Amino acid sequence: MNYLPIFVDLKNRPVLVVGGGHVAVRKIYALLKADALVKVVAEKLHSSLQILVNEGKVEWLAKAFEASQVTSSYLVIAATDDNALNQQVFDTAESQQRLVNVVDDQPRCSYIFPSIIDRSPVQIAISSGGAAPVLIRLLREKLEALIPHNLGAMADIATRWRSAVKTQFPQLTQRRRFWEKLFTHQSFQRLTENHQIEQAEALVESELQNNNPVLGEVSLVGAGPGDAGLLTLKGLQTIQQADVVLYDALVSEAVLELVRRDADKVFVGKRAGKHSVKQDDTNQLLVKYAKQGKRVVRLKGGDPFVFGRGGEELEILKAENIPFSVVPGITAALGATAYAGIPLTHRDHAQTAMFITGHLKPDGNRLKWETLAQGNQTLVVYMGTIKAAELSAELQKHGKPSDTPVAIISNGTLPNQQVQTGVLSELAELAEKAPTPALIVIGEVVKLQKDLAWFGKEAVQFVSTQETLWQKPTLQNKETHWKQAA
């Protein structure tokens, strides 16, 4: 981030503008909207600027620039076509530690003006840091069409009723829930759109009098395999309404960035063999936060009902009579294989896809290896790298050919995604080299990966320790290139 987006209170603060042409006029109009005390230094004034001076809205300070004029200024703007003068203004402001903007000259700007969408008192600022002003203009045009014009009226009403709402709801969570309900109320939106402010305020009063106690709830949300673009629309809406988010180790940083800024984020991650938070502790946290009247999101990598223990958590909530909902996510078996170029089913190679986990309960049922070893199917193994040797041996023992194509996808759908391909007899060796989290894919469909890979750089081949019948094993990675001698 090259610039920190901030909003500055310029009311009754002196701002020096050096220049009196049409460029200066544009900046001055914006400054006057913020009630700044604008002082102009220019040899002559644009006709529009002269009118502002005559009306007493702008002070014509002097015709020539002097360093002393900067001393008493809160902000400085240089808007002339004289490069030497602009440089002088910039150097003077910098030496006096005053923020300065030389118009259309980014290297000589300690601050810049963003593009503004004005729904006062609601304002939205957009900037590319000077990198792509045309792109920002196009974006602003799209947002102007999308953002309703009644936002300002809604915000004004909220300002007038803030004190009454705070008295009625002393807890922050209660107030937040009230405002969210009001701002999404169709009648409130319609009344403000039609400028029926008195009726809109009557609705606020009615909602205050009839408001029910705030009830807590829990939403299990699938975060998807990693790429934030794969988070569902409903998932995005849910995490942006949350008061507290309990997230696991498989949720990507990009997805966490989409969580509402003032929500509490609680890490409850665990990995096979490396438990950092016990499942029972996570269950109790869900219950505790919900009973505090909070909107709780349990954010899980992939889909909460695919090896995510989501069902176990809902059973606890059901026993405690806590309302809950589930927002499905794109599971890793779907997302990671798609990004790796491996179709799970194909008429020529696989008519069945099976998902299994390599992390079973110690006293759990054994896997049905006879079924897993059958042909014409794709086997996807979650959390299987630490059991890769056993997986390979058991499948071969029960009839799976040793030259069956396999792939290990690490960090699927993320920029550092890595795909290794080989054959079943080499699975343990491949797993040792694979970063985690990783997904194992076993089946003839892996043959297609070389031709169908589209995400990241082209796969790099390496020499295997043994011959294969279909192709040499490959490693796909944006940054890594390794070879193993025969």
From Swiss-Prot:
Region (Uroporphyrinogen-III C-methyltransferase): 216-486
E.C. numbers: 2.1.1.107, 1.3.1.76, 4.99.1.4
Stated family: In the N-terminal section; belongs to the precorrin-2 dehydrogenase / sirohydrochlorin ferrochelatase family. In the C-terminal section; belongs to the precorrin methyltransferase family.
Name of the protein this chain belongs to: Siroheme synthase
Binding sites annotated in the UniProt record for NAD(+): 22-23, 43-44
Reaction equations catalysed: uroporphyrinogen III + 2 S-adenosyl-L-methionine = precorrin-2 + 2 S-adenosyl-L-homocysteine + H(+); precorrin-2 + NAD(+) = sirohydrochlorin + NADH + 2 H(+); siroheme + 2 H(+) = sirohydrochlorin + Fe(2+)
Pfam families on file: CysG_dimeriser (PF10414), NAD_binding_7 (PF13241), Sirohm_synth_M (PF14824), TP_methylase (PF00590)
Signal peptide residues on this chain, from the entry's feature table: none
PROSITE patterns: SUMT_1, SUMT_2
Any one GO MF annotation of this record: sirohydrochlorin ferrochelatase activity
Binding site for S-adenosyl-L-methionine: 225, 301-303, 306, 331-332, 383, 412
Pathway of action: Cofactor biosynthesis; adenosylcobalamin biosynthesis; precorrin-2 from uroporphyrinogen III: step 1/1; Cofactor biosynthesis; adenosylcobalamin biosynthesis; sirohydrochlorin from precorrin-2: step 1/1; Porphyrin-containing compound metabolism; siroheme biosynthesis; precorrin-2 from uroporphyrinogen III: step 1/1; Porphyrin-containing compound metabolism; siroheme biosynthesis; siroheme from sirohydrochlorin: step 1/1
Superkingdom of origin organism: Bacteria
Gene Ontology biological process terms, A to Z: cobalamin biosynthetic process; methylation; siroheme biosynthetic process
Gene source species: Actinobacillus pleuropneumoniae serotype 7 (strain AP76)
Biological role: Then it catalyzes the NAD-dependent ring dehydrogenation of precorrin-2 to yield sirohydrochlorin. Finally, it catalyzes the ferrochelation of sirohydrochlorin to yield siroheme.
Phosphoserine PTM sites in chain numbering: 128
Annotated catalytic residues: 248 (proton acceptor), 270 (proton donor)
Region (Precorrin-2 dehydrogenase /sirohydrochlorin ferrochelatase), start-end ranges: 1-204
